[in-house]
Amino acid sequence: MAQSIPYQNLAVEYGLKHIPTLREYLSIPCDANYKEDMYKNIEWVEKTFTQRGFTATHLETPTLPVLLLERKASNPSAKTILFYYHSDGQPVRPSEWQQENPFIPVLKQKKGDTWEQIPFERLTQNYDPEWRIFGRASSDDKGPGIMLLAALDAIKSLGISPDYHLKILVDFE
């Protein structure tokens, strides 16, 4: 059990380091009914992963492309791991959100039966794992995409080079 503590600390460290990335990603509207917004999401995802050594291929569909991201291992016969996530959110009614704009993420803490907005700066002062980030598509499904990025960056920081090919399919509908 004690051996897992450094990894838990690493997970918290890289989770917190990626909050600005999550905020940036959540700030891009992602209603698939608005193609121009979805192309901004495609651009952002492609740029963010290619900066980490992935190649990107647009797999055309009748509506929006699916993005195939690949990073090859040094061994050409290595096995492949495939991840999937989607980058669109359900249509949103801003009036139903208890914040100024669902595409401007906010940090909140539980206060009684409600959630109270607090400054993001508090994360660097006294992190509380019970705080939550509210923003359209934060848990379904942009947040998990950022968790994957954080994990990849944490692995790299340890000097680990995965011995498998990595593919990620990102759907925008």
Regions found by a protein language model. Name each.
Residues 133, 137-151:
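Active-site alpha-helical elements of protease catalytic centers
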Residues 88, 140-141, 171-173:
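Acidic side chains
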